[in-house]
């Protein structure tokens, strides 16, 4: 299950589908998430997990990176920041429209049904949107 999710995330990054993530591809995804990394920062991020030193990240290296990230479970601040990326209007809730917007920016074309399904999965109190507690 987890591996399948990571595979999906990997293909979001791997825009040309060649099985590796370049600094360019990494930059594209990060910018679509509202980050603005420098070329050097992107290179550092890749170097951190680039076990074979070829300058790109392949899927096994990506898994290593994700495992590390999961281990030092994201700081409260990182989680809040991620929430803010989705919560465009800053009202403390992620609506279906906001979720669709971010996913579209990531190159994920989701049907309304898929977006609604994602909201339903996280929406504990049944109000049709996701608040911070539900997001975490």
Curated annotation (Swiss-Prot):
Binding-site list for Ca(2+) 2: 50, 52, 54, 56, 61
Residues engaged in binding Ca(2+) 3: 87, 89, 91, 93, 98
Sequence positions that bind Ca(2+) 1: 14, 16, 18, 20, 25
Domain EF-hand: 1-36, 37-72, 74-109, 110-136
GO CC term, one of those recorded: cytoplasm
Annotated keywords: Calcium, Metal-binding, Methylation, Repeat
Residue positions, PTM N6,N6,N6-trimethyllysine: 109
Binding positions for Ca(2+) 4 per the UniProt entry: 123, 125, 127, 129, 134
Molecular function (Gene Ontology), one example: calcium ion binding
Record-linked Pfam families: EF-hand_7 (PF13499)
Other observations noted: This protein has four functional calcium-binding sites.
Family stated for the protein in its record: Belongs to the calmodulin family.
Function, in words: Calmodulin acts as part of a calcium signal transduction pathway by mediating the control of a large number of enzymes, ion channels, aquaporins and other proteins through calcium-binding. Calcium-binding is required for the activation of calmodulin. Among the enzymes to be stimulated by the calmodulin-calcium complex are a number of protein kinases, such as myosin light-chain kinases and calmodulin-dependent protein kinase type II (CaMK2), and phosphatases.
Protein name (record): Calmodulin-A
Gene name of this polypeptide: calm1
């Amino acid at each position: 299950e987890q591996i399948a999710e990571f595979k999906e995330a990997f293909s979001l990054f791997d825009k040309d589908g060649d099985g590796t993530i370049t600094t360019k591809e990494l930059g594209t995804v990060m910018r679509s998430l509202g980050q603005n990394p420098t070329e050097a920062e992107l290179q550092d991020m890749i170097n951190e997990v680039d076990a074979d030193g070829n300058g790109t990240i392949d899927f096994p290296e990506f898994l290593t990176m994700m495992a590390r990230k999961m281990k030092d479970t994201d700081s409260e601040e990182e989680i809040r920041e991620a929430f803010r990326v989705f919560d465009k209007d800053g009202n403390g809730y992620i609506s279906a429209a906001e979720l669709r917007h971010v996913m579209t920016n990531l190159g994920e074309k989701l049907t309304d049904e898929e977006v609604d399904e994602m909201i339903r999965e996280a929406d504990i109190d049944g109000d049709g949107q996701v608040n911070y507690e539900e997001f975490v």
